Curated annotation (Swiss-Prot):
Keyword terms: Cytoplasm, Immunity, Innate immunity, Nucleus
Localization in the cell: Cytoplasm; Nucleus
GO biological process, alphabetically ordered: innate immune response; macroautophagy
Listed name of the protein: Protein ILRUN
Annotated organism of origin: Danio rerio
Short name of one Pfam family: N_BRCA1_IG
Keyword Nucleus: yes
One GO CC term, this protein: phagophore assembly site
Signal peptide stretch: none
InterPro entries: C6orf106_UBA-like (IPR039517), Ig-like_fold (IPR013783), N_BRCA1_central (IPR032350), UBA-like_sf (IPR009060)
Function summary: May have a roles as negative regulator of innate antiviral response.
Entry's Gene Ontology molecular function annotations: ubiquitin binding
Biased composition (Polar residues): 241-254
Compositionally skewed regions (Basic and acidic residues) per UniProt: 219-230
Length: 283
């Protein structure tokens, strides 16, 4: 009789434990949290339903089901390298979260791994980003495009690495976001992107009279004019050419008198070469 009472008491305790929380969504969330987000909500619901929605029994069933021979990849969260980390973000504003992670295991990650949203607030429509397979002890940065909620407040979400077969592994990455009117995170990241874009543009030559505020056509015209100028100064005819023109007077005569005065004035004729710079310097 006493044995029957003990069995009855255990059965009643089982029922009372199941009736402690009637909201199945709460049980699924608690089950997932206790497992460190190693299982998706559908998997949590499967084990809970199998154990009559008893949280403790479901956790035991999960660990009994897991095979100890599975070699789970390893991942450690290194640091948050988000541009403007710690600043609040305005409502309904796009931003980028970047985390530095490391493969702390002894084997390379399998192909097809990803960083996946697992719980809390999901910022935007992106719930997964592919991550390349890291070698042992290799470090890499992973970025996720997000959008802040439309209502100011404090928000949080969780992300985890996941294999192609759905096995979660590594540290849980938390997103804790402060949404405030007048937040600077969006502006900070925009300025950083503009600076990066400016630094990656081809460098312009600053030689000559380059004006950074002038139009490209103006600078191009000035450059072409500079090419036409003699770097030694104003253009002058070569001295040999001048002397050649002057020496050409040896073979001709110059009549510098009107027709009416030809009888009284003689015609000047140069019979010797002129070496000086002035053609009439010698008589």
């Amino acid at each position: 009789m006493e044995g029957m009472d003990i069995d009855l008491d255990q059965e009643l305790m089982q029922k009372f434990s199941c009736m402690g929380t009637t909201d199945k969504d709460v049980l699924v969330s608690e089950f997932q949290r206790l497992l460190g987000f190693q299982l998706n909500p559908a998997g949590c619901a499967f084990f809970l339903d199998m154990t009559n929605w008893n949280l403790q029994a479901a956790i035991g069933a999960y660990y009994d089901f897991e095979s100890p021979n599975i070699n789970t990849p390893s991942m450690s969260f290194v640091e948050d390298v988000t541009i403007g980390e710690g600043e609040s973000v305005p409502p309904d504003t796009p931003f980028t979260k970047t985390w530095r992670i490391q493969n702390t295991g002894t084997e390379s990650w399998p192909p097809g791994v990803c960083l996946k949203y697992v719980g809390g607030d999901q910022f935007g429509h992106v719930n997964m980003v592919m991550v390349r397979s890291l070698d042992p002890q290799e470090i890499s940065d992973v970025s996720v495009q997000m959008r802040s909620p439309a209502v100011p407040g404090m928000y949080q979400g969780q992300w985890r690495m996941c294999t192609a077969t759905g096995l979660f592994y590594g540290d849980v990455i938390w997103v804790i976001l402060s949404v405030e009117e007048g937040g600077l995170l969006g502006v900070t990241q925009q300025l950083s992107s503009f600076k990066t874009e400016f630094n990656t543009q081809p460098h312009r030559s600053l030689e000559g009279d380059y004006n950074p505020f002038a139009s490209p056509q103006k600078n191009k015209q000035d450059t072409n004019e500079d090419h036409l100028k003699d770097p030694g100064g104003p253009w002058e005819a070569p001295l040999d050419s001048i002397q050649q023109d002057q020496n050409g007077l040896n073979h001709s005569s110059v009549n510098i008198t009107p027709n009416g005065l030809q009888n009284n004035l003689s015609v000047v004729t140069y019979s010797q070469g002129i070496n000086g710079p002035f053609p009439f310097g010698q008589s």
